[in-house]
Amino acid sequence: MDKPGRASPESRSGAPPDGSRKARRKKKRRKNAPILRLLVKLAVLALFTLLLFTFVVDVHICRGNGMYPFLQDGDVLIAYKLETCQVGDAVVYRRPDTGEKAVSRVVAVNSDTVEITPLGELLVNSFVPDDKVFYATKPLEGSAITYPVSLTGGVFLLDDHRTEGLDSRLFGEVPRSELLGKVVYVFRRRGI
């Protein structure tokens, strides 16, 4: 029997009692396991979020009232990147003249011909489109765009509030590569 205050023969030799080192490691691993699991879950969530916002959706804040009444200044938009935009869709795109993000509505695609008459009438392929816009569509003063415009694979975009909009009447056809996505959801920030 060992006397109090004296080291046992096992501890004098420097070797711990059988299994104590393994037991301490195992206990430490069990103690750290929830933290490691949480870190792995957070890393997976961060990777998923990065992939989602890189390849699937785009978030955009609407600036100005060019798309009024559909969108208002300050609305937060979710745009879906994987869908091909069609006539009538509201889209987020990068403006060819400034590179800024903007929102407008697709009125013509691919090889359509767009004409805006001096009286404020929009014609696509010589027909009046079925859009529910309340504002007259007039050419923008000072624009270098001449009508009719024949598209070469891109899209022609107009804002819903045609008197305030800075759209394809200013910078012409927008290449499809500049389309960032179709607006699929709107969060209204006003009145919150």
Residue spans for each PLM region:
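Hydrophobic membrane-insertion alpha-helices, especially the h-region
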Residues: 37-55
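Soluble "head" domains of membrane/secretory-pathway proteins
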Residues: 2-33, 55, 61, 69-192
